[in-house]
Regions:
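Conserved HGGG/HGGXW glycine-rich cap/lid loop of the alpha/beta-hydrolase fold
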Residues: 11-77
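Conserved acidic catalytic loop of the alpha/beta-hydrolase fold
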Residues: 88-106
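Flexible "cap/lid" loop of the alpha/beta hydrolase fold
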Residues: 123, 132-161
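Short beta-strand/loop motif that positions the catalytic acidic residue
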Residues: 226, 232-234
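Conserved alpha/beta-hydrolase catalytic His-Asp/Glu region
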Residues: 164-207
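Acidic catalytic loop of the alpha/beta-hydrolase fold
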Residues: 237-241
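Catalytic active-site module of serine/aspartate enzymes centered on a nucleophile-bearing elbow/loop
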Residues: 256-294
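Active-site nucleophile elbow and catalytic-triad environment of alpha/beta-hydrolase enzymes
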Residues: 206-222
Length: 294
C-alpha cells in the first residue's frame, strides 16, 4: 500500500502495511532513533510470506512521524524529572495505530527500545497483544541490560554534520555494536543509512526517546502478570543491551521462551533472520493454539 500518515494519539504517525490485508496482523516496533525501514524490506516480505499482515511505523520523534517538543535532559531522568513523554505514551501510539487500522489485537515484535514499547503495550493493553517477541531488549531493571562503556562514545558523541558524515558515523557505530559472529554487510548498511538520512534525522527526538527509556521504572513485576505466548531473543555478544536484560525479560514473563544467539550483537544481520522469522511464527502459532484450547 505504500507509506501513509494518520493522526494517532494526538501525534502524526507514518506507517506502512505489507502483505495480505486478511493475514495475521504483526506489529513491528523499532528501536532508538530507528525509522520503520530498519525493518528490512526483504525481511518484511518474508514475514508476509508466512501469512502475516506486517505493520511497521516510525515511532514519534523519528523519521517521517511527528517531531515532538520539550527539552530532554538525560541526567534529569535519574533525578526523577518528568520526561517530555514516556514509554507508556509510545505504547499508546501503537495501540491507537491498531485502532486506526481496525485491528482488535495483533502479534507484536519489538527490537531494543521497540521491545520496551512492546512490553509496555502488553502491560497496558493486554487484550491488544496476541503474542510478544522481545528482541535485544530489557525489563528496565537497574541491574541488568547495561551497555558496555566502550560503545557509549558512538551513541553520545557529537552529531555528525552532513550526509556523508552521518553515513560514516552509522557504519562506524554498527561495526562497534553489531554482530561479531556474522559478516558485516557494508553495502546494505550504507544503503540503510542513506534512506534513514533522507527520511530526516532528529537528534533531539532521539534524545527524548532515550530519556523515555531512562525514566521508565522496572517492568518485571508487571511482566509477571502477562498471560500470552512470548519469545525473548538476545545476542550473546550484544554490547549495547547486555544479555542479562534478555535473560531477565524471559524470567519475568511466565512461560516465555528464551533464545540466546551466539555471535549476535545489537543488530539483526541476515544470518539471524531464519531464526527470527521462525520464532515469530512459532510464537504466533502458540497464541492460536491457546485461543483454540480456551
Amino acid at each position: 500500500m505504500g507509506e501513509q500518515t494518520a493522526e494517532i494519539n494526538g501525534v502524526r504517525i507514518c506507517y506502512e502495511t505489507i502483505g495480505d490485508p486478511e493475514g495475521r496482523p504483526l506489529l513491528l516496533v523499532m528501536g532508538l532513533g530507528g525509522p520503520m525501514i530498519w525493518w528490512d524490506d526483504e525481511l518484511c516480505e518474508l514475514l508476509a510470506g508466512r501469512g502475516f499482515r506486517v505493520i511497521r511505523f516510525d515511532n514519534r520523534d523519528c523519521g517521517r512521524s511527528q517531531a515532538m517538543s520539550g527539552r530532554a535532559w538525560l541526567l534529569g531522568s535519574f533525578l526523577r524529572q518528568p520526561p517530555p513523554y514516556t514509554l507508556a505514551d509510545m505504547a499508546d501510539d501503537a495501540a491507537v495505530l491498531l485502532d486506526h487500522l481496525g485491528i482488535r489485537s495483533a502479534h507484536v515484535t519489538g527490537v531494543s527500545l521497540g521491545g520496551m514499547i512492546s512490553q509496555t503495550l502488553a502491560i497496558r493493553h493486554p487484550e491488544r497483544v496476541r503474542s510478544l517477541v522481545s528482541v535485544m531488549s530489557t525489563t528496565g531493571g537497574r541491574l541488568v541490560g547495561w551497555p558496555n562503556p566502550r560503545v557509549l562514545p558512538f551513541l553520545l558523541g557529537k552529531a555528525p554534520a552532513g550526509r556523508e558524515a552521518y553515513i560514516d558515523a552509522v557504519l562506524a557505530t554498527f561495526r562497534q555494536i553489531g554482530s561479531p559472529g556474522f559478516p558485516f554487510d557494508e553495502n546494505r548498511m550504507r544503503t540503510r543509512a542513506v534512506r534513514t538520512y533522507e527520511r530526516g534525522i532528529n537528534r533531539a527526538g532521539t534524545l527524548r526517546q532515550l530519556v523515555a527509556i531512562t525514566s521508565a521504572a522496572d517492568r518485571s513485576a508487571q511482566l509477571k502478570k502477562l498471560r500470552i505466548p512470548a519469545l525473548v531473543i538476545h545476542g550473546k555478544a550484544d554490547p549495547l543491551v547486555h544479555v542479562s536484560g534478555g535473560r531477565a525479560t524471559a524470567r519475568a514473563i511466565p512461560g516465555a521462551e528464551l533464545m540466546l544467539v551466539p555471535g549476535m550483537g545489537h543488530d539483526m544481520p541476515r544470518g539471524v533472520w531464519p531464526a527470527l522469522i521462525d520464532g515469530i511464527d512459532r510464537t504466533a502459532n502458540r497464541a492460536v493454539s491457546s485461543e483454540q484450547a480456551s
